[in-house]
Design a protein with these regions (language model features):
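NAD(P)+-binding Rossmann beta1-loop-alpha1 motif at the extreme N-terminus of oxidoreductases
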Residues: 1-38, 110, 172-174
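Short acidic capping loops at alpha-helix termini that bridge into adjacent secondary structure
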Residues: 12-15, 39, 72-73, 179-180
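Small-residue helix-packing motif on alpha-helices
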Residues: 15, 43, 177-184, 206, ...
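Rossmann-like NAD(P)(H) cofactor-binding subdomain of soluble oxidoreductases
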Residues: 22, 31-32, 39-114
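Short acidic-hydrophobic, aromatic-tinged amphipathic segments that line or gate anion-handling sites
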Residues: 35-40, 139-141
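Internal alpha-helical scaffold of NAD(P)-dependent oxidoreductase catalytic cores
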Residues: 86, 90-95, 111-148, 160-198
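NAD(P)-dependent Rossmann-like dehydrogenase/reductase catalytic/cofactor-binding core
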Residues: 186-242
Length: 242
């Protein structure tokens, strides 16, 4: 997220971080022009918005002792399975909001699932949503759907990367150099996504627009149907939500 904010024009000097391995943290922060802090207490003291990017099982241990110091701060959670209700148990009375970003936020093309329920004031929420909007598309969801949206947006990049790799392999099989194969496939995925977002067209209609009667594309579509592509993708999401 820090890389995405820096790319979007947020001053690196306005950001700081802490981590378990301080030496490695210093190196990464220096590369970006950020400040490295020795512990979470330093981060909270230096910040207005505190991004909670720790493993879910560590949250209570890390944040409960910081409750008083966080009284006039905003906690922006990116922790999996930690919704507003859970945070309120650990930090009652503290302003907090739960989100699930994905890896493309680092290039400002991410999707961030954002829980509608929060303890933020209207002004605080507007500030946070403005910051998140610099990283990509923000989708506000009910609490019951936050981690469903987070799963589709956050886990599916791995599935798309597998598809890019497989299509790249197919191109290489038929003679395209590897680097060119990935350029072709990745740009195709990017362009197709942009077309759908720009037009709002149903994906099925987009597919039909490419399929000529008796043509090559419809034969490929049938091959994918025979291989169970749709079912495999649905099952992948089902598995991640179990």
């Amino acid at each position: 997220m820090a890389d995405g904010w820096i790319a979007a024009g947020v001053a690196a000097g306005d950001m700081c971080a802490c981590a378990g391995r301080y030496d490695a943290l210093v190196e990464r922060c220096e590369e970006r022009g950020m400040a490295a802090c020795h512990d979470a207490t330093e981060v909270v003291a230096a910040s207005d918005i505190v991004v909670a990017a720790v493993k879910p099982y560590m949250i209570e241990k890390v944040f409960a002792p910081l409750k008083d110091a966080l009284a006039d701060k905003v906690v922006l959670s990116v922790a999996w399975t930690w919704d507003s209700a859970k945070w309120e148990q650990v930090l009652p009375g503290v302003a907090h909001i739960s989100t699930v970003p994905n890896t493309p936020v680092s290039v400002d093309e991410g999707v961030i699932a954002c829980e509608k329920a929060s303890t933020l004031s209207d002004e605080q929420r507007a500030t946070v949503l403005g910051l998140l909007g610099k990283l990509g598309t923000v989708v506000e969801l009910d609490s019951s759907l936050l981690f469903v949206g987070g799963t589709v947006g956050g886990c599916a990049p791995a599935f798309v990367a597998m598809a890019i790799e497989a299509l790249g392999d197919a191109a290489v099989k038929h003679g395209i150099p590897r680097a060119d194969a990935y350029r072709i496939v990745s740009q195709m995925v990017l362009g197709t996504a942009k077309l759908q977002l720009a037009t709002g067209q149903h994906p099925a209609a987009m597919k039909d627009a490419v399929c000529s009667p008796g043509g090559a594309t419809i034969k490929g579509v049938v091959a994918l149907e025979d291989a169970g592509m749709r079912s495999a993708l649905v099952k992948a999401i089902d598995a991640t939500l179990q």
